Amino acid sequence: MSDSSIKMPPVFGKLLLATQAHLGGVKVTKPMKKYIYGERQDKVSVFDLKKTWDKFILAARAFCGLNYGDDVTVISCKTFGKKPVLKFAETTGAKSYTGRFIPGSFTNTTIRNSCEPRLIIVSDPIVDKQAIEEAAKVNCPTIAFCNTDCDLKYVDIAIPLNNRSPKAIGASFFILSRIIRYIKFGTPMDQDIKEVELFFYRDPIELEKLQEDQNEDNYNEIFNKFSNANEDEFGKIIYK
């Protein structure tokens, strides 16, 4: 059933498309078929973003149904899921769990840093399978970002999207955090949309390339000033 009480801001739709969150894979499991809008010529499935949005709303309402944000644990064992998870936790007050999931973290209280969450959010039910199974043992519901090949066993709220893309995962955690803030505090969802950059993972090679491009742009700007300046202006640039 569609939840029409909260409309998707157009900028969110553009963000999901720009980060390719709407693109699934070639393999589609039976539970995920209902979230597919169509198929491209290369057999890649395309998600129905209207259904994705409805699941975003449902997940946000489940989060807001708890009295305290730290009752929720957000998990990602993926390298590129670390930054969006940490930023989401910072924004919403949830607990974060990144890197390798230690077996028994939810079921064995003698383990260091063990916790008893009332709700967990995972970036990939395949990679984060151990966390989902342990949550099920302690009757803790699970929200998961699910691709077309995901098995929804023990997943209570599946948000259908491309969870293999670092940009898509970052955008998805950003959107979910904005919906939660809107429901809790009435903060406009599309306010300061550029903050989505804070949720994006960038590997060291990409950061180095960006730095090189920036340095090159600065060099070109200075070079153009010198080449286009007359004698008087040249002196002003040098001693500015």
From Swiss-Prot:
Localization of this protein: Cytoplasm
- A Pfam family for this UniProt protein? Ribosomal_S2
From the record, give the transmembrane residue ranges: none
Which GO CC annotations does the UniProt entry carry? cytosolic small ribosomal subunit
Q: Which SUPFAM superfamilies match?
A: Ribosomal protein S2
Q: Which UniProt keywords apply?
A: Cytoplasm, Ribonucleoprotein, Ribosomal protein
Q: Name one GO molecular function term.
A: structural constituent of ribosome
**Which cysteine residues pair off into disulfide bonds?**
none
Q: Which domain of life is it from?
A: Eukaryota
Assembly: Component of the small ribosomal subunit. Mature ribosomes consist of a small (40S) and a large (60S) subunit. The 40S subunit contains about 33 different proteins and 1 molecule of RNA (18S). The 60S subunit contains about 49 different proteins and 3 molecules of RNA (25S, 5.8S and 5S). Interacts with RPS21.
Give the similarity note: Belongs to the universal ribosomal protein uS2 family.
Q: What is the annotated role of this protein in its UniProt record?
A: Required for the assembly and/or stability of the 40S ribosomal subunit. Required for the processing of the 20S rRNA-precursor to mature 18S rRNA in a late step of the maturation of 40S ribosomal subunits.
Q: What HAMAP family does this protein map onto?
A: Ribosomal_S2_euk
Full protein name: Small ribosomal subunit protein uS2
Organism, scientific name: Enterocytozoon bieneusi (strain H348)
Top-level taxonomy: Eukaryota, Fungi, Fungi incertae sedis, Microsporidia, Enterocytozoonidae
Q: What gene does this protein come from?
A: RPS0
